[in-house]
Amino acid sequence: MKRFLLVPALVLASCNSVYYAAWEKLGWEKRDLLVSAVKSARGEQKEAGEEFQDALTQLKKLSGYHGGNLESAYNKFKAEYEDCEAQATKVRSEIREVDQVARDLFREWEREIRQYENASLAADSRAKLADTRSRFEQLSSTLHAAEASMEPVLRQFRDQVLYLKHNLNAAAIGSLRGKADTIQSDIQRLLEQMNRSIAEADRFIQTMK
C-alpha cells in the first residue's frame, strides 16, 4: 500500500519542479513566487469580505420583506450565498498555494545553506531563514484564522437558503429578522479577522522586498 501512495507524491514533486523551473527561466525565484501568492491570497480575502457583505445585504432585504416578488428576493440572496461559497473556495485555494510555495522555499533555502563553504555566510543565511520562517508562520496563522472564520457564516447562510427553499412564506421570512442580526455579528468578526490577515500580509510583503 505504501509503495502505491508514494506515486502521487513523486508525481506532485515532479510537477512542482517543472513549475518552478519554468518560472526560474523567466527570472522568478521561489521568493518572488511566495510574495505573488501572498498578494493573491490577500486580494481574494478582500473580495471575500465584499461578497459576504453583499450576501448579508440581500438577507436583510429578504428579512424586511413587505410585499413584492418574494421568490425574486430569495433568488437574489441564494445567488449571493453561492458567490460567497465560490469566493471562499478561491481563498482556501490561494492559502494552500501560499503554504506550498513557502514549504518549497524553506526546503530549498535549507539545502543551499548546507552548500556554503564560508561558515560566516552560512550562519548569516541561517539567521535570515529563521527570521523569514518566523514571520511567515505568523502570517500563515492569520491566514488560516481568517479562512476558519468563513465557515460559521457560510453554514448559517446555507441553512437559511435550504430552509427558505421549502418554506418561502411570510412566516418564514419573519423568522429571519433575528437571524440576520446574529449573522451580521459573525460577519463583523469575520471581517475583523480578514483585516488582520490582510494587514499581516502587507507587513510580510514589505519585509520580503
Predicted regions located by residue number:
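Long amphipathic alpha-helical segments with strong coiled-coil/leucine-zipper propensity
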Residues: 49, 60-126
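Positively charged n-region of N-terminal signal peptides that target proteins for export
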Residues: 1-4
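Long amphipathic all-alpha helical oligomerization modules
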Residues: 19, 144, 148-209
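Primarily heptad-repeat coiled-coil rod domains in cytosolic scaffolding/tethering proteins
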Residues: 22, 29, 36, 65, ...
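C-terminal motif of bacterial Sec signal peptides marking the signal peptidase cleavage site
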Residues: 12-14
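Immediate post-signal-peptide N-terminus of mature secreted/exported proteins
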Residues: 17-84
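Long amphipathic alpha-helices with heptad-repeat character
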Residues: 41-52, 81-84, 88-102, 143-150, ...
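Extended amphipathic alpha-helical interaction segments
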Residues: 94-174
